């Protein structure tokens, strides 16, 4: 075995690259379902979010009262789903 081949075998192994930090998850807008706030990225998007609510289920409505198909009343705490498609579900029948 030649001298040059021995030198190649004795070279140190390349170091492993340092692990990259995982990307930070963007903060989500998750206030209580009964509170309204200004639309933020990752929460309420689209034209229906203008002046709407940021809800935990990421659905929007224009006012704090649900626009139900049958009536414009808000059944607080009833747990019934809304009739309006642009009003969030799972908020006790209210946005």
Curated annotation (Swiss-Prot):
Tissue expression from the record: Skin-specific. Expression was readily detected in adult trunk skin, adult arm skin, fetal skin, penal skin, vulva, esophagus and tongue. Not expressed in the cervix, rectum, lung, colon, or placenta.
Pfam families named among the record's database cross-references: LCE
Signal peptide residue numbers: none
Annotated keywords: Antimicrobial, Keratinization
UniProt feature, compositional bias: Low complexity: 1-13
GO biological process terms, semicolon-separated: defense response to Gram-negative bacterium; defense response to Gram-positive bacterium; keratinization; killing of cells of another organism
InterPro entries the record matches: LCE
Location of the region described as Disordered in the Swiss-Prot/TrEMBL record: 1-29, 68-95
Record bears the keyword Translocase: no
Family named by the database record: Belongs to the LCE family.
Function statement: A structural component of the cornified envelope of the stratum corneum involved in innate cutaneous host defense. Possesses defensin-like antimicrobial activity against a broad spectrum of Gram-positive and Gram-negative bacteria, both aerobic and anaerobic species. Upon inflammation, may regulate skin barrier repair by shaping cutaneous microbiota composition and immune response to bacterial antigens.
Name assigned to this protein: Late cornified envelope protein 3B
